[in-house]
């Protein structure tokens, strides 16, 4: 098993510590992880290849799990270990040097993930590495501002685009604006979202092309699919 495969998919829900407590649902050689950020402004699901026996694993401290995995070499083995009760209570992680144990938690200690009521989306656009790199650079240049707004418009050349503005839209604030080609039927409202959450989602999925769908009701959906994993996120607008 490749360490990089495991780490990259954990990071898709961990989002640089925005989510720590999750349940890994193992079925048919795949792990399905539903999650919510601690601030409850985003929920999502990550599905990836994980050749382990079927069952549910309660991960209370994803940051501790990542720290353990990150000291290993690229080729690792992961096994499930049962305690005296016959229930799985540890993840055993091994490489050619280390034998590591990660203690699993009681599944009832993991908060339930809120359900998302999807709606019709008013515009959508594609994202790739060029978009992600540009967004991260702009966010860093503004010292990781909290605000990002999106709205659609049609250029003088007749192109439908989404305008993305990092920073406050007030006249005297520092901000970065850029556009991407978008699909929509009518112009949208100006919709505010968390720049920090969007940043971490994009950073965790760098290297995978995706799509962003936005509703004027204040819901953003992001989807990233590859041969080995699928990631889906819902971010709610800021007030």
Residue ranges and their predicted role:
Residues 1-102, 121-239:
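DNA polymerase processivity clamps
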Residues 99, 107-108:
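Charge-dense, extended regions
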């Amino acid at each position: 098993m490749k360490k990089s495969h495991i780490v990259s998919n954990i990071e898709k829900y961990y989002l640089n510590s925005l989510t720590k407590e999750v349940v890994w649902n193992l079925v048919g050689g795949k792990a399905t992880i539903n999650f919510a950020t601690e601030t409850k402004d985003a929920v999502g699901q990550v599905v990836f290849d994980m050749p382990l026996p079927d069952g549910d694993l309660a991960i209370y401290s994803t940051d501790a799990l990542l720290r353990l995995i990150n000291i290993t070499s690229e080729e690792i083995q992961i096994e499930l270990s049962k305690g005296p009760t016959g229930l799985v209570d540890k993840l055993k992680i091994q490489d050619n040097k280390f034998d590591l144990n990660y203690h699993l938690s009681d599944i009832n200690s993991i908060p339930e993930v809120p359900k998302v009521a999807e709606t019709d989306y008013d515009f959508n656009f594609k994202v790739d590495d060029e978009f992600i790199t540009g967004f991260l650079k702009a966010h860093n240049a503004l010292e990781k501002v909290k605000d990002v707004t999106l709205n659609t418009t049609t250029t003088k050349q007749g192109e439908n685009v989404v305008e993305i503005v990092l920073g406050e839209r007030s006249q005297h604030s520092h901000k970065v604006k850029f556009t991407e080609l978008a699909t929509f039927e009518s112009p949208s409202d100006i919709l505010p979202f968390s720049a920090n959450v969007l940043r971490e989602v994009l950073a965790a999925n760098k290297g995978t092309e995706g799509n962003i769908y936005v509703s004027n009701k204040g819901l953003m959906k992001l989807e990233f699919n590859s041969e080995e994993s699928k990631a889906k996120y819902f971010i709610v607008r800021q007030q």
